[in-house]
Amino acid sequence: MTLVQDRPTVTTNIATIKQWVTAMAKGDLDHAPYAEDAELSDPNGKYKGKAQILQSFKVWKTAFPKATAEVTNQIAQGDHVATEVVYKAIHTGPLVASSGTIPPTNKPIELKVMLVSAFRDGLIVRERAYFDRAGLMQQLGITIPPKP
């Protein structure tokens, strides 16, 4: 394929991610663009299948129900899209974490996230999300003791 032929797919994939990031921040998970066999990995773990991925987003939406998201940059090539996002929210619900449930702190957060998404037939099949988990805990006022 030539670059010109790839452009509509690249443009569509970029738009899909941008729309999804906005919808997810609002809690609209109904049209999540993940394939049934998709995989997501982030600092909290690995999720296999659309159902597990959506459950991980529900945990975040419970803790941060009124989040906003701004896509600040996107770069795409072929079936891959890299997206920088800034999420802003207030922690008003319980946050289920690997160490236990963190009760609401009512503190604002700003979380910078890098998404690297791979598409197949217009759906996300693999995604890696990178963010500063320790920085998030610090914003919530949670101190994580160093490992011995």
Task: Outline where the language-model segments fall.
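C-terminal and inter-domain tail/linker signature
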Residues: 1-148
